């Protein structure tokens, strides 16, 4: 048996459900909405990706092109191009924001997991008390 957060994982226990939020938020309030919906849906944990855009993106001018839905009824999309660095900056948070998000997850009974890719991320997740860490 393994205990993650307030849940026991093992034989005879209910399936442990982790919601993968990754870097899909656009800041603290958006991330809190993801946590809230994961809890409302009956999740046991939520996992985010924690990174430093300056460490992750070498070429700050590298463009990324993607489609956004502009009309739900017709399915019409529009192409957007922007620096990949800017996208990652929007999806990064400060240490205090990560602490607040972890506390919010705890208050809703969700274990808080994180994927990290560098030593700074490791120190952060250890300091905020992540229940599980994935190294990418």
Tell me the role of every PLM-derived stretch.
Residues 20, 38, 125:
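Conserved, mostly hydrophobic/aromatic
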Residues 22-24, 49-53, 117-119, 136:
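Active-site beta-loop-alpha junctions enriched in small/polar residues
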Residues 44-92, 121:
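Glycine-rich, proline-tolerant flexible connector loops at the mouths of alpha/beta enzymes
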Residues 87-93, 110-118, 131-136:
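Catalytic beta/alpha-barrel core
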């Amino acid at each position: 048996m393994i205990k993650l957060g307030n849940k026991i994982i093992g034989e005879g226990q209910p399936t442990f459900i982790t919601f993968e939020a990754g870097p899909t938020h656009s800041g603290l309030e958006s991330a809190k909405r993801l946590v809230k919906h994961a809890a409302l849906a009956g999740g046991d944990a939520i996992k985010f990706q924690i990174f430093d855009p300056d460490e992750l993106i070498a070429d700050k001018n590298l463009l990324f092109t993607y489609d956004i839905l502009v009309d739900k009824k017709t399915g019409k999309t529009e192409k957007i191009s922007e620096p990949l660095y800017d996208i990652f900056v929007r999806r990064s948070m400060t240490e205090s924001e990560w602490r607040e998000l972890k506390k919010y997850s705890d208050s809703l009974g969700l274990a808080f997991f994180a994927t990290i890719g560098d030593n700074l991320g490791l120190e952060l997740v250890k300091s905020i008390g992540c229940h599980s860490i994935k190294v990418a």
